[in-house]
């Protein structure tokens, strides 16, 4: 499906800023991008889209389900393409790199903990903080 069709299916017009920002996410080597990351990528491509427009489009994409937002301890929101698969995150407290992982045993345990405490789990997000392998090598 083309980006134009995807946006239209989500109820959004396929404007130049929306198409360009979606393209940035699709071709980025990084999976998690802040508004500032997107803005810098646009500048690097000599595309004139203001930071306020970037924030507005990211919010629209989040509301439409195209992107998901995470707020890690870094204090700034980061966005990633919503592929529909649940995953958790490991964050390096030294360099800020975000690693994704999925573990079925952890998922089962979380549902059990919720059930054992009288909860029906609707949603969850697990974020683990530590030092990544690359940063450990530099110590």
UniProtKB/Swiss-Prot annotation:
InterPro entries in alphabetical order: FUR, Fur_C, WH-like_DNA-bd_sf, WH_DNA-bd_sf
Binding site residues for Fe cation: 86, 88, 107, 124
Pfam families, A to Z: FUR
List of residues binding Zn(2+): 32, 80, 89, 92, 95, 100
GO biological process: negative regulation of DNA-templated transcription; negative regulation of siderophore biosynthetic process; positive regulation of DNA-templated transcription
UniProt-annotated location(s): Cytoplasm
Signal peptide: none
Stored NCBIfam families: PRK09462.1
Protein name: Ferric uptake regulation protein
Gene name as annotated: fur
């Amino acid at each position: 499906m083309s980006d134009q069709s995807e946006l239209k299916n989500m109820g959004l017009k396929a404007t130049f800023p929306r198409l360009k920002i979606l393209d940035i996410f699709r071709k980025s080597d990084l999976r998690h991008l802040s508004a500032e990351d997107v803005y810098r990528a646009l500048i690097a491509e000599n595309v004139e889209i203001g930071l306020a427009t970037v924030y507005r489009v990211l919010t629209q994409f989040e509301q439409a389900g195209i992107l998901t937002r995470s707020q890690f301890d870094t204090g700034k929101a980061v966005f990633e393409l919503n592929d529909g698969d649940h995953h958790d995150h490991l964050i390096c407290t030294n360099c800020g790199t975000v690693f994704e992982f999925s573990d079925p045993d952890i998922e089962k345990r979380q549902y059990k903990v919720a059930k054992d405490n009288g909860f029906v789990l609707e949603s969850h997000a697990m974020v683990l903080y530590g030092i990544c392998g690359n940063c450990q090598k530099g110590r």
